[in-house]
């Protein structure tokens, strides 16, 4: 079991119904989506179901990054970065 790191402000979403409600309110189809700090991937799972053009996942925590790699590496439209969100170059998506 992963314990949230309070130093990183981590809180894990556990209820898939809440994740689904969040994603249902957003137009994701054929959009480039950047998800910062996805934690264990509950919202990520719902984003992927909505078929984004590309999903960019940015996770600073090394353990969560490894978990996300295992879950999503084989999905063609998903890129996963182990980096602080402040250091990511967002200008490539303009």
Question: Language-model segments: which ranges?
Answer:
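Catalytic cores of RNA-modifying enzymes
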Residues: 1-94
């Amino acid at each position: 079991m992963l314990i949230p790191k309070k130093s990183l402000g981590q809180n894990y979403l556990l209820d898939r119904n809440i994740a689904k409600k969040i994603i249902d309110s957003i137009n994701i189809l054929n959009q480039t989506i950047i998800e910062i700090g996805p934690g264990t991937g509950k919202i990520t799972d719902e984003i992927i179901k909505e078929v984004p053009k590309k999903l960019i996942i940015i996770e600073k925590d090394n353990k969560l990054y490894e978990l996300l790699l295992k879950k999503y590496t084989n999905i063609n439209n998903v890129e996963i970065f182990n980096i602080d969100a402040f250091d990511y170059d967002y200008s490539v998506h303009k």
